């Protein structure tokens, strides 16, 4: 609905603004969104990015529902989980119990947290589609760039980098 669209627009607005400023050397002013950038108005670019964000969020939640990680993939259910999480945290604070993380999540932070958790759940379950990797996939990713850990300037060998390489391949496939 319009509430979901507005939220997603708010999520992408800053990044879109920065992208337009950088790509078109544009200055941010009152008419920024009404300006034309190579034949497309700023508000159209913002709308396109908003729709892409909505599609991504729906894909994540539809997959999570399909896998049984959430029982309801709707925006309303997400909003309810956010409210429930904050109520639970507030109750613990009132009782003097220890809570980890924030006392209260903004909707955007909760969305980021939940998407990150769902992605991690999916990627860590090797029985899920695409998560069992071939040695060729791991090797291709490893050879695509340097793998440097800590203060060491040298490229790590595959066995040292394997966990990170496998995580990256799974996240790309996700």
Name the predicted role of every residue range.
Residues 1-107:
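N-terminal targeting/tethering segments
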Residues 64, 118, 141-142, 165:
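Buried hydrophobic packing residues in well-ordered domains
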Residues 100-119, 150:
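A structural signal for short loop-to-beta-strand junctions that line the ligand-binding cleft
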Residues 101, 124-158, 173:
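Acidic/polar surface patches and capping/hinge elements
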Residues 67-68, 100, 117, 125, ...:
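Intrinsically disordered, low-complexity, Lys/Arg-biased terminal tails
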Residues 62, 114-129:
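A short glycine/proline-enriched turn/edge-strand or helix-cap micro-motif
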Residues 158-174:
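Extracytoplasmic/luminal low-complexity segments enriched in Pro/Gly and acidic/polar residues
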